[in-house]
Amino acid sequence: MRISFDIDDTLVCDASVPTEREISRWRRWRYPERLRRGTRSLMAALVRRRCKIWIYTSSDRSTHYLKSWFGSCGIQIEGVINRTVHERKVGLRGPSKYPPAFGIDLHVDDSPGVAMEGVDHRFEVLVVAPDDPDWAVRILDEVDARIRANPYWHARFAPRPAPGIEQFLPGLTQALRWMAVTP
């Protein structure tokens, strides 16, 4: 499942919204924007569910900047859609965001206007407000519901049990039993 996130007022909010813990001075100088608290753990939980994380922003932040910024926070970004990429693929007359053009299954944004465009152009948008303290839980609940509802995703993304050692070494169990009874 591909999930895209808006940046402004979704992952980066104003000073009244709690942010992730302090980062090094070098990173603060290079990446002055602070991620909303819970972003790292949310992204880690999505990766554990085998989701691909994308950034979809109407700003002109470069792909390199966004990938290196999130990478410095321990978050691997699969792809970036900025204004230039969006306009090249969707055009100037289309909606402000159009995730299906990039194979994205769910877009997370703070704007009700993007949600209305989603209804008009038939793409899925989850709106999270900057002041919502349970925003990450809402996103995970939505992703889990979508995974359960889609048999393909359910089979593909469901957690798999760790393989037993017997699968790797078929004769190991029998050899261990033989060694235990042999003096």
Model-derived segments and spans:
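Short hydrophobic segments within beta-strands
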Residues: 6, 54-56, 108
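Short, basic/glycine-rich phosphate-binding loops at helix/coil junctions
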Residues: 12-26
